[in-house]
């Protein structure tokens, strides 16, 4: 792996009906931003080969929306370890990824 892209989840919907913070979905604005970022990264030739994302609904939705808009087809690993993770925990998760990818996106 040579490049790591850090992508923050899109704007979440505080008005949605959700139980716990972990279940909060993207707002329409967040979906639009994720699509825009997916297309941007593809246009910039920064298409991720692999993805690593938090199990939070808004993070998974951000990744799925960006990937669809950008035409990304690489595998994704969803992990609870990234939800509310410390910088050290994020680094451990990145280090656990395989080296066969040139570009990894972390959401």
Model-derived features: positions:
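Surface-exposed beta-strand edges and their flanking turn/coil or helix-capping segments
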Residues: 19-20, 91-93, 107
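Short phosphate-binding loop-to-helix
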Residues: 82-100
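Active-site-proximal alpha-helix that buttresses catalytic centers in soluble enzyme cores
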Residues: 2-3, 7-80, 85
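Generic beta-sheet signal
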Residues: 4, 97-106
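Short, well-ordered coil↔helix boundary/capping segments
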Residues: 84, 106-107
């Amino acid at each position: 792996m040579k490049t790591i892209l850090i992508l923050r989840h899109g704007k979440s919907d505080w008005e949605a009906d959700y139980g716990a913070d972990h279940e909060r979905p993207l707002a329409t604005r967040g979906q639009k931003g994720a699509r825009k970022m997916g297309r941007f990264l593809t246009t910039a030739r920064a298409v991720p080969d692999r993805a690593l994302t938090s199990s939070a609904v808004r993070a998974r939705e951000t990744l799925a929306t960006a990937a669809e808009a950008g035409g990304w087809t690489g595998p994704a690993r969803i992990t609870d370890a990234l939800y509310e993770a410390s910088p050290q925990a994020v680094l451990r998760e990145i280090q656990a990824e395989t080296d066969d990818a040139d570009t990894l996106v972390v959401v």
